[in-house]
Amino acid sequence: MIPARDTIAAVATAPGRGGVGIVRVSGPRARAIAITLSGREPTPRHAHYGPFHADDGEVIDEGLLLFFPGPHSFTGEDVLELHGHGGPVVLDMLLQRCVDLGVRLARPGEFSERAFLNDKLDLAQAEAIADLIEASSAQAARNAVRSLQGEFSRRVHQLTERLIQLRIYVEAAIDFPEEEIDFLADGHVLAQLDGVRTELSTVLREAGQGALLRDGMTVVIAGRPNAGKSSLLNALAGREAAIVTDIAGTTRDVLREHILIDGMPLHVVDTAGLRDTEDQVERIGVQRALSAIGEADRILLVVDASAPEASDPSALWPEFLDFSPEPGKVTLIRNKADLTGEAIVLRCDNDGQATLSLCARSGEGLELLREHLKHCMGYEQTAESSFSARRRHLDALRLADEHLRHGHDQLTLAGAGELLAEDLRLAQQALGEITGAFSSDDLLGRIFSSFCIGK
């Protein structure tokens, strides 16, 4: 356990009023503070009900006091929890009393950071705490719990252990070249390397599903005024989220709705109609729409199928493609298909341009759109996803896979054992970034600073 230099405290419950509020303390002064506030020696891991006293003996609040001696606590240090009434004033008084007794206010994520530094959990498990708090669906919450319990870390450790054993074998073959047997050419190394790559591919696929359930994707609905953009937003949201009228330019700002499609979070953004206008407010709305288009994972370009104008995105709005750097991210939505009598169908041309005919008002074609959005993000409802993952985890897994692929080429094409050994080392280092075995202080600072205060 890393010795703590000071004692920290923070409110561990969400801001606002509630039935119960918790002040958490961690560090070497936790036990002394428990005695001072309650007037008695706390029994480890037992709940004590009683008053919490101010310096002059006045009762600040009454509630439960729990003391967890280190190293058998969340942070690995002595931890004190004060469970009082959930009013912000009362909690602030309790927190200030702790500060007066020699503690300092905790930074965001500092409790979890101390748990990580004291080997109570690894980096992936620490991130799972934040993922569980922020989960937007039941499946995402279940995945976060599995990661918190170590499922993701266990898979990464298994891969790392296989890499270590393979490195030992390869480096031994390099260090003893006088042996008559060419250990690099006997097929054992190649078989083991292929096995690790196969397992890594499986973990990467599951991590991709976990990341989708955690982050979802951002879908921007864009198009000319009166094309039916707001009607499409309402249809996807299942409620009247946006005002719908026959007046062009009704939507002048960006509207956001968060929905779920088979457990996958979808962040839908409705935008102002794209057109040249002299109205200053509407012009600002168009600029915000173009900004949202540039940041989208997927763009639904809505056109009025009953209008005679072209369905080519560049013809509908000349600047559109300038703000959408990847044309492949655009799905053309031919809305009001009920007026044209065209089939409700999804088509893809030779250039990969997807076009979907639907009717937002009646809901015809919406299920096709939902399936299309899941397909665009590679989400499979039936695919196994047993843990939560973040984009940095995917980047690390892909980097490890790239090193293993390169190492495979070095072995099979050049027989270069030294270069293979280096690629194995780099792959192991990439995996270590996930659990924190190889992590810079800058990375740790960025991760834990995004946590809630008190976590």
Swiss-Prot record:
Single Gene Ontology BP annotation: tRNA wobble uridine modification
Domain of life of the organism encoding this protein: Bacteria
The positions annotated for binding Mg(2+) are S230, T251
What does the entry list as the binding residues for (6S)-5-formyl-5,6,7,8-tetrahydrofolate? R24, E81, K120, K455
Annotated EC: 3.6.-.-
**Positions of disulphide bridges:** none
User: Taking every annotated instance into account, which residue ranges of this chain make up the domain TrmE-type G?
Assistant: 216-378
Q: Which Gene3D superfamilies match?
A: P-loop containing nucleotide triphosphate hydrolases (3.40.50.300), Probable tRNA modification gtpase trme, domain 1 (3.30.1360.120), tRNA modification GTPase MnmE domain 2 (1.20.120.430)
Any one cellular-component term (Gene Ontology): cytosol
Molecular function in Gene Ontology:
GTP binding; GTPase activity; metal ion binding
* Coiled-coil annotated residue ranges, if any: none
Q: Which keywords does UniProt give here?
A: Cytoplasm, GTP-binding, Hydrolase, Magnesium, Metal-binding, Nucleotide-binding, Potassium, tRNA processing
Location of this chain's protein in the cell = Cytoplasm
* Binding-site positions, GTP: 226-231, 245-251, 270-273, 335-338
* Family annotation (Pfam families): MMR_HSR1, MnmE_helical, TrmE_N
InterPro entries, sorted: G_TrmE (IPR031168), GTP-bd (IPR006073), GTP-bd_TrmE_N (IPR018948), GTPase_MnmE (IPR004520), MnmE_dom2 (IPR027368), MnmE_helical (IPR025867), P-loop_NTPase (IPR027417), Small_GTP-bd (IPR005225)
What cofactor is this protein dependent on?
K(+)
Which residues of the sequence carry a binding annotation for K(+)?
Answer: N226, T245, I247, T250
What does the entry comment about cofactor binding? Binds 1 potassium ion per subunit.
Q: Which CDD domains match?
A: trmE (cd04164), TrmE_N (cd14858)
This chain's function reads:
Exhibits a very high intrinsic GTPase hydrolysis rate. Involved in the addition of a carboxymethylaminomethyl (cmnm) group at the wobble position (U34) of certain tRNAs, forming tRNA-cmnm(5)s(2)U34.
Please name the HAMAP family in this protein's record. GTPase_MnmE
Similarity comment: Belongs to the TRAFAC class TrmE-Era-EngA-EngB-Septin-like GTPase superfamily. TrmE GTPase family.
Quaternary structure and partners: Homodimer. Heterotetramer of two MnmE and two MnmG subunits.
Protein name, per record: tRNA modification GTPase MnmE
